[in-house]
């Protein structure tokens, strides 16, 4: 999923975010929302916030509906737990293919369709489109928690080593979860429950991101037995020191079933990809293969 090592660099802003632009538009439902526009990739992403009352079954049903909407390229479900926050509110990052449209044309196109994403007619469920300021704040809370929120986020202190990344005062580790559509349901539920039931020590966080890529509908027309989507997963854990973060990682691995454990791998050299995804930024590993590691 996350490609190969391609280069090393030292930055306080991830290279994959440098072309991202944060736009604002109002949709037909009257909501103002932020759109992350990526001109090189010709895609735009919106961040949606759910309710604590949403069940895992609700979210799975909603995603099945959203997969069929024109232009939907990726649906990323973000579950988070923090030591100082008792609620667990899911977020969704939905990325759309602009289909060759220029930015203004794409935003107009998206404004007419987004209501069918956050409030589909077939379900009594509504997500809340996040305004540009909320998108900026949430992304900064992962990448630059002690710095002033900016977009793209810039950390005052950032050190990425081969196995860990320090974002300001927070130390983070990222893992990839190897999933397949045919055998992922139990594993996904295990990681979701891990986040929802985690007993965290002071300063600890855990994030699980499930990435769903719908199969091209034209392809499905001619291959009825094909999988409707591809799945990948990312886990990001955080603490106040590197040693505590490693202890957290050990506890996490030991708490998993053997079946889930063998599908968990460290994102060596690519910790930044996991952190950005957990922060609601479309830094998809199959689109970006940059690596940067701090030289001692």
How would you describe each model-predicted region?
Residues 1-296:
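Extended, folded cores of ATP/NTP-driven motor/assembly subunits in large transport
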């Amino acid at each position: 999923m996350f490609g190969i090592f391609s280069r090393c660099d030292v930055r306080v802003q991830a290279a994959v975010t440098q072309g991202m632009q944060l736009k604002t538009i109002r949709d037909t439902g009257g909501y103002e929302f932020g759109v992350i526009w990526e001109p090189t990739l010709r895609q735009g992403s919106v961040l949606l916030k759910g309710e604590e009352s949403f069940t895992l079954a609700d979210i799975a049903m909603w995603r099945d509906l959203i997969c069929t909407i024109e232009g939907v390229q990726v649906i990323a479900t973000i579950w988070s737990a923090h030591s100082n926050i008792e609620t667990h509110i899911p977020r969704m990052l939905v990325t759309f293919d602009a289909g060759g449209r220029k930015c203004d044309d794409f935003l107009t196109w998206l404004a007419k369709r987004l209501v069918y994403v956050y409030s589909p007619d077939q379900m009594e469920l509504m997500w809340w489109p996040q305004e540009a300021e909320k998108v900026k704040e949430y992304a900064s809370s992962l990448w630059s928690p002690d710095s002033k929120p900016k977009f793209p986020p810039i950390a005052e202190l950032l050190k990425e080593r081969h196995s860990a990344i320090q974002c300001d005062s927070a130390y983070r580790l990222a893992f990839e979860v190897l999933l397949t559509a045919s055998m992922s349901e139990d594993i996904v539920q295990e990681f979701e429950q891990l986040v929802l039931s985690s007993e965290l020590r002071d300063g600890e966080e855990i994030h699980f991101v499930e990435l769903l890529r719908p199969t091209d509908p034209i392809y499905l027309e001619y291959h009825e037995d094909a999988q409707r989507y591809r799945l990948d997963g990312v886990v990001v854990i955080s603490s106040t020191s590197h040693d505590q973060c490693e202890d957290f990682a050990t506890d996490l691995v030991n708490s998993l079933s053997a079946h889930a454990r063998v599908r968990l791998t460290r994102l060596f050299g690519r910790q930044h990809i996991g952190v950005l995804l957990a922060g609601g930024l479309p830094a998809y590993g199959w689109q970006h293969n940059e690596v940067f590691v701090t030289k001692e």
